[in-house]
């Protein structure tokens, strides 16, 4: 082990963002402390009674240091860093299929439109049984292992063996790997003749472009007012949030600002010229909406551009700077805090080093009744703020508090349904059903509108699910739970079938048919 590695790394990290005087003073102090760590590591490596994995020892030391800071400063090794960054880069290299595993066999749900697999003729329902002469079907290979074989550098070939329904012999395709987009937008469709909904799952490099494209699509379909669904959106890039906010706000409007100890304060303002600056907006959030999702919803709320509906957001308002280490690993170090235009700090309170308590915050909210009862939420006067145009009262203290609270419906899904879905019984039943009936369904339902209106989940399919559940000792407690579980299963099955025949917009169109948060947003926009 290079005994100077820890010293040089620490001094480099310390020097980032400090002025000259602070650098000199702090570096002198830290150099003395780091020598202890270096000497300890060297002595362990040289003299400890057993052999030691010095690489792991250093990683554990870094994790130990960061764990004493805030909940979001973190270290990731090279492999973890690559996986973490992939959803935010907007693409990866692969063959371009969406798939699920059915009884140890990969079943193609959909080839990515215009992707490499679609170009060579791979179809929905195909089973990929081997990759480059390696059998992947029926061998209990993990999903991660299969993905490693399907992915590879752009331009390389994947030789695939395909089993197709009603064709006896295995088919073989050579697929040239290419850049495969990782889309942020899950759904974009019209809820009413005037109101459109866009749901997206993160804030990546391509998210702004996807949102603009989705808005343009819905405007062509008659959209005048918009619901932005940020429920369960964990955030992503700050710049993506600022770019999206600019599509709704006037030029110069403050979106968010940051304040830190060793970095300059920074403001992000709307660039103006947005694509949707007139219509009404409702933003949907919940306890899992975080980071960039809170920046966007906070800006729309504080600038009185729209209303926020749902439950208090997660409360992640710490700015991380990614600090790359030469071996491909990375430290994400908190350097500042986010503040909404009205001055609210997005970050919820935390105890340094108490990562367990921080992780249980949502559970604590549930136990205290915050997710189910608005009367359980109280704010001191010190946490009251005013919006910038209408001077409406909004609340700080961590996260974004919605203008209109919609409680979590804890009785909507039965215990029996949750157990059945957790075992994968519904997913597998859907895969078998769509595999047998895809062509028949496409012929019978030429449009999604017809499917949504007329399709009913067959009783036999429901019976298959209950039969498999009984084998796994899962049963409804009584007739009332059975009836409610029937409804839960029929709804998710219809949505999954719609997804497999069309796409995710059709899936959410069914899932959201009786959703209380969406219904409340529609009601408010129609006033």
Question: Model-found features: residue ranges?
Answer:
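Residue-level recognition of conserved beta-strand edge/terminus positions
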Residues: 131-132, 163, 334, 349, ...
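Cleft-lining beta-strand/loop regions that shape enzyme active-site pockets
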Residues: 20-33, 37, 41-54, 77, ...
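Polar, glycine-rich mid-to-C-terminal structural blocks
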Residues: 292, 304, 311, 315-383
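Conserved functional hotspot residues or short segments at active or partner-binding sites
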Residues: 345-346, 350-527
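N-terminal, post-signal-peptide region of Sec/Tat-exported proteins
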Residues: 45-83
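Bacterial Sec-dependent N-terminal signal peptides
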Residues: 1-30
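Structural motif
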Residues: 125-127
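PDZ/PDZ-like peptide-tail recognition elements
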Residues: 60, 72-110
């Amino acid at each position: 082990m290079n005994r100077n590695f820890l010293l040089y790394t620490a001094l480099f990290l310390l020097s980032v963002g400090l002025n000259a005087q602070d650098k000199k003073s702090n570096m002198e102090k830290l150099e003395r402390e780091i020598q202890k760590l270096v000497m300890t590591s060297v002595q362990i490596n040289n003299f400890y009674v057993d052999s030691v994995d010095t690489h792991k020892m250093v990683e554990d030391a870094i994790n130990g240091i960061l764990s004493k800071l805030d909940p979001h400063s973190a270290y990731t090794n090279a492999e973890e860093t690559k996986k973490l960054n992939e959803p935010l880069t907007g693409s990866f290299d692969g063959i371009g299929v969406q798939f699920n595993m059915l009884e140890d066999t990969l079943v193609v749900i959909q080839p990515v439109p215009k992707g490499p697999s679609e170009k060579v003729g791979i179809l929905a329902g195909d089973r990929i049984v081997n990759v480059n002469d390696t059998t992947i079907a029926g061998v209990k290979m993990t999903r991660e292992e299969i993905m490693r074989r399907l992915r590879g550098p752009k331009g390389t070939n994947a030789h695939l063996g395909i089993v197709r329904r009603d064709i006896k012999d295995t088919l073989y395709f050579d697929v040239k790997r290419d850049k495969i987009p990782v889309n942020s937008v899950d759904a974009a469709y019209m809820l009413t003749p005037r109101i459109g909904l866009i749901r997206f799952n993160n804030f990546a490099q391509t998210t702004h472009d996807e949102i603009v494209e989705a808005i343009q699509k819905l405007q062509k379909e008659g959209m005048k007012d918009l619901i932005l669904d940020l429920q369960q959106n964990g955030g992503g890039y700050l710049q993506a949030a600022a770019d999206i906010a600019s599509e709704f706000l006037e030029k110069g409007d403050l979106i968010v600002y940051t304040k830190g100890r060793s970095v300059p304060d920074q403001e992000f303002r709307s660039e103006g010229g947005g694509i949707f600056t007139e219509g009404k907006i409702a933003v949907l959030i919940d306890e899992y909406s975080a980071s960039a999702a809170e920046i966007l919803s906070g800006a729309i709320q504080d600038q009185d551009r729209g209303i926020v509906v749902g439950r208090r957001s997660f409360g992640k308002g710490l700015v991380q700077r990614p600090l790359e280490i030469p071996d491909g690993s990375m430290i994400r170090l908190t350097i500042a805090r986010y503040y909404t235009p009205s001055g609210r700090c997005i970050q919820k309170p935390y105890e340094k080093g108490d990562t367990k308590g921080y992780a249980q915050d949502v559970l604590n909210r549930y136990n205290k009744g915050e997710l189910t009862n608005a009367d359980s939420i109280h704010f001191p006067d010190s946490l009251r703020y005013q919006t910038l145009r209408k001077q409406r009262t909004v609340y700080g203290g961590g996260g974004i508090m919605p203008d209109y609270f919609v409680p979590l419906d804890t009785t909507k899904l039965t215990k029996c349904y949750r157990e059945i879905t957790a075992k994968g019984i519904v997913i597998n039943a859907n895969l078998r059903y769509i595999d047998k009936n895809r062509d028949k369904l496409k012929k019978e339902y030429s449009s999604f509108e017809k499917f949504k209106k007329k399709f009913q989940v067959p009783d036999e399919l429901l019976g298959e699910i209950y039969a498999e559940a009984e084998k796994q000792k899962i049963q409804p407690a009584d007739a009332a739970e059975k009836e409610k579980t029937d409804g839960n299963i029929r709804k998710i099955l219809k949505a999954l079938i719609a997804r497999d025949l069309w796409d995710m917009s059709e899936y959410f169109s069914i899932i959201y048919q009786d959703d209380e948060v969406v219904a409340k947003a529609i009601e408010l926009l129609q006033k």
